Each structure stands twice: as C-alpha cells, then as structure tokens.
C-alpha cells in the first residue's frame, strides 16, 4: 500500500556557527562572558558558545516554512552582530578564517568541551572550523533512517553549493571546502552507513554506548544523521554560508529533497542507493572543486557540470518547492551553481593582489568581504 504524509511534518530548524573577529584587526577574538550574557538576554537558548572561545552558535526554533526560518535566522544574525559590536567584535559566517592560526585559540571551559579535549587529544585542537546544520522534521524513526539512506546521494551536491573555506592559516589550500579536511580527522565522521531500520541504527549506537566509547548518538558526527535531540533528520555536510539568503536556499533544497523522497515512497518508488565508495568520490570532488568542476552522474557514467545538475534538482523538486512555499529560494540555487563563497573569496584576494596589495592586505580584504556578506541580507 502507498504511504501518505503531511506537509506539516517537514518542519525546519537551522543551526549556524560563526567566528568572532576583532573589528579593527580582523583577527579572531574570544567572546567575553558579557557578550554571551547580552546575546542570551535577547535570544535565550537560541545562542550558545561553541568548542572554541572565538566561536558562537545560533539555532532557530522549529519553523513551519522557509519564510519563518528567514525571519528567525535574520533576527539571530542581526542580534549577534549588534551585541558583538558593543565589544568591538563582529561575527562572520565562514567555515575557515582566512589567516588565523588554530594554535592561538583556546577551547571553551565547559564540561562537554573539556571532555572532548580529553577524548580527542591534539586532533580536536585544530577544529577552527564552522558548519551549518539543517534539521527537517520526520516524526517516524524508520522514516529518518530510510530517507537517510537515499538522501546520502545528494550530500556532495549540497557540499559543492555551500563551499566557503578555501583558505587556511593564510594560504590558499586549493580546495573549495578545507573545513571538511579538518573535520574528517575526527572519528565517526563522513558519509553515514546504510541501515535497514531504525532498530539496526539504534543497536549500533547502543553497542558503542554500552562499551562507554560514547555517551550517546550526539557524538556521532556523520554528514547526515537522525538527530539525537529532535524528531528530525539532520544534514551536517554543508559549510556555513556567509550570506543569509544562500543559507536559506540550501535549507530549502534539503527540505524539498526530503519531501521528494517521501513522495516517491508514497508511490512505491525510491531513489537508488549507491555504494558509499562511489558517493565518496563525488564528496571529494565537491570538497576539492566546489562548483568549478562537475560531479559524477552514476546513471549516465559521466561528469556533469553543477549548473546542469542544479537544473535537474530544481525540476526534480518542483512540486515539492511549490507545496512547501520555497520556489524562489530553490531557484536561487542557480546562482550558487555558478559561484559560491569560496569563489568570491578567491576573487577578492586575487583582485587585491593584482591592484598591488600585499598578501596580508589581501587576506584582510577577504575578511572585510565576509563581514559585508554577513550583513547583506539583514
């Protein structure tokens, strides 16, 4: 029998991690306790410290639509920027700071982060990276695991469109998402395994918990996972987007893909589940090239340019975008398929150098550009 679903189930929640920079030097700066208190006074539990003291995390409430998510996330960004400004600081939404040194940073003194530092040793010290996580509501536990198996195919597409981390410690890495290179040093990361049911997933988690390897599934950091805290499927592969509207377009696509896969299942159809080895090749291509080169279409047996793939995704999710009220946001992905933040950052750097600026001046120009991007849609 074909299964049905309600569009009310596909709620959205968006989490973003920001870096705090000194408004004068553009280098990283630690968040003073008074700043966190000021943010909490206005945003309550929607704002929190992150692993490093130069980071801050925000999270929307449960949003019924992309319009609700826009209003919530815009307020979060604007409030954090306003509060930070009182202390001579400013937030940037970027996955790697262009020139800051991870060795100069300190981790936040909280039980969870102290435990991470003890468990992960020197690997976690390099986690000077920020990501964006998108939660889509799926009330059924088995639905979350089933859709996770199918959605994994699209993770490289989402990564390519989100890339914002070409620089690391003052040099061009040659990658569009260096963040993933750093993050993949942690255990329990990468593409999720394929589970036949939620029970199988839970047994796997319980095995590690029972052996005291982890406390719970929140210590599993796959690119896509059933949330440990909410009845959602959490997409975690994306770099954080400097611009608000880019983040919303990516979140809208994730929401639409989730609905599309559920819709197919309602007609007794499903997306083909490819071997993780093949999807990992596309993941690497997205990490390396962003949108400047294509991804492999395994059905065609060919590398297809990102603009063409995005056109296909828009067509594939057309009725889902209409049902969810996010047609404009999904259509905007055509712009990202041509140029992501990584491309813009490199363009700023090269332009400053071509105009006679020093390497240091060019790096500062990139941060200045990121500061402008943070405010462009507020």
Swiss-Prot record:
Q: Which GO terms of the molecular function aspect are on file? A: ATP binding; glutamate-cysteine ligase activity
Q: What class of enzyme is it?
A: ligase
Instruction: Look up the record and give one Gene Ontology term from the biological process aspect.
Output: modified amino acid biosynthetic process
The keyword Acetylation appears for this protein: no
Keywords in alphabetical order: ATP-binding, Ligase, Nucleotide-binding
Enzyme Commission code(s) on record: 6.3.2.2
What this protein catalyses is: L-cysteine + L-glutamate + ATP = gamma-L-glutamyl-L-cysteine + ADP + phosphate + H(+)
Give the highest taxon in the source lineage: Bacteria
Q: One Pfam family for this entry, by name? A: GCS2
Provide the family line.
Answer: Belongs to the glutamate--cysteine ligase type 2 family. YbdK subfamily.
Query: What this chain does, per the record?
Result: ATP-dependent carboxylate-amine ligase which exhibits weak glutamate--cysteine ligase activity.
Return the protein name: Putative glutamate--cysteine ligase 2
């Amino acid at each position: 029998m074909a299964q049905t679903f309600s569009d009310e189930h596909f709620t959205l929640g968006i989490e973003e991690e920001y870096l705090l920079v000194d408004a004068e030097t553009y280098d990283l700066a630690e968040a003073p306790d008074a700043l966190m208190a000021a943010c909490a006074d206005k945003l309550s539990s929607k704002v929190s410290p992150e692993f490093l003291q130069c980071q801050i995390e925000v999270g929307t409430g449960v949003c019924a639509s992309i319009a609700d998510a826009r209003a919530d996330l815009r307020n979060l960004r604007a409030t954090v920027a306003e509060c930070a400004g009182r202390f001579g600081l400013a937030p940037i939404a970027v996955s790697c700071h262009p020139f800051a040194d991870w060795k100069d940073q300190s981790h936040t003194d909280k039980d969870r982060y102290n435990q991470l530092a003890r468990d992960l040793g020197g690997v976690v010290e390099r986690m000077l990276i920020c990501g964006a996580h998108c939660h889509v509501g799926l009330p059924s536990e088995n639905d979350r695991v089933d859709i996770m198996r199918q959605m994994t195919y699209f993770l490289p597409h989402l990564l390519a469109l989100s890339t914002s981390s070409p620089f690391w410690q003052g040099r061009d890495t040659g990658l569009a998402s260096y963040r993933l290179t750093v993050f993949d040093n942690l255990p329990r990361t990468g593409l999720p395994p394929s589970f036949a049911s939620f029970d199988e997933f839970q047994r796997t988690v319980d095995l590690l918990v029972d052996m005291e390897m982890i406390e719970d599934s929140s210590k599993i950091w796959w690119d896509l996972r059933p949330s440990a805290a909410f009845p959602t499927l959490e997409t975690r592969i994306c770099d954080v987007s400097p611009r608000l509207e880019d983040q919303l377009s990516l979140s809208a696509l994730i929401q639409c893909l989730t609905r599309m896969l559920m819709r197919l299942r309602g007609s007794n159809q499903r997306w083909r589940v490819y071997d993780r080895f093949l999807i990992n090749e596309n993941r690497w291509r997205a990490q390396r090239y962003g949108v400047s080169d294509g991804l492999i279409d395994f059905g065609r047996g060919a590398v297809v340019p990102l603009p063409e793939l995005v056109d296909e995704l828009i067509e594939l999710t057309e009725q889902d975008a209409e049902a969810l009220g996010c047609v404009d946001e999904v259509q905007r992905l055509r712009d990202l398929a041509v140029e992501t933040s990584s491309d813009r950052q490199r363009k700023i750097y090269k332009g400053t150098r071509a105009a006679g600026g020093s390497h240091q001046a060019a790096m500062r120009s990139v941060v200045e550009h990121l500061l402008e991007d943070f405010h462009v849609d507020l």
